Amino acid sequence: MLRSCAARLRTLGALCLPPVGRRLPGSEPRPELRSFSSEEVILKDCSVPNPSWNKDLRLLFDQFMKKCEDGSWKRLPSYKRTPTEWIQDFKTHFLDPKLMKEEQMSQAQLFTRSFDDGLGFEYVMFYNDIEKRMVCLFQGGPYLEGPPGFIHGGAIATMIDATVGMCAMMAGGIVMTANLNINYKRPIPLCSVVMINSQLDKVEGRKFFVSCNVQSVDEKTLYSEATSLFIKLNPAKSLT
């Protein structure tokens, strides 16, 4: 039982949600959110430059924004918490409302966006729909330290999971992690910038296979490699 619970928690924790504008399968449009100041703060796009971004991250951001000009790539927005309409859609399709506590849900924040600027996960993702590629530009802050001076392996795994998961989701809809294998080649220096390059390799029914590598900005150092399997969720089946 404990093993089953742990697996379920790991899967839920690896959930990748859609960018703004993409709805869950079968969901109906809802009225726009009212403009409360707290909601505006929560829905502030965190994937744009802030003062904590170093020159490497800013330079890469500018380079990929240039690639977006012809429409081949697009930047994905990112927020501190899941927008209200997405929460309602997800609860409707995949969760038993009786098991959800509204107070806990109202306090929830996305793990990778729960740190103050510069202290944790600073990142932005770009997607190429034709090539089925997702690239994440990631700067790991001082609160992500593992071995002295280096980023914790779990933090690296988190960003790999988020990147390959978003790649699978953009290709096929709402997915959850079924398997993630990571080979760590070299430790990543704290507060440095890396590129996480992911690629959709194949699709078998509801199974999406995605691989990725983590490289230095100059692409001369390989830090990690990973393979993954994601399962597309069935709106007709609850997760609880």
Curated annotation (Swiss-Prot):
Family assignment from sequence similarity: Belongs to the THEM4/THEM5 thioesterase family.
GO cellular component, one term: cytosol
Chain segment of the transit peptide: 1-36
Subunit structure of this chain's protein: Homodimer and homotetramer. Interacts with AKT1 in the cytosol.
Active site: 161 (proton donor/acceptor)
Tissues of expression: Expressed predominantly in skeletal muscle, testis, uterus, brain and kidney. Down-regulated in glioblastoma or glioma compared to non-neoplastic brain due to promoter hypermethylation.
Record PTM N6-succinyllysine, positions in chain: 55, 66, 98, 207
Residues recorded as bearing Phosphoserine in the entry: 37-38
Binding site residues for substrate: 183, 185, 206-207
InterPro entries recorded: HotDog_dom_sf, THEM4/THEM5_acyl-CoA_thioest, Thioestr_dom
Effect of residue 37 to A: Abolishes cleavage of mitochondrial transit peptide
Organism: Homo sapiens
Transmembrane segments: none
Protein name from the UniProt record: Acyl-coenzyme A thioesterase THEM4
Encoding gene per record: THEM4
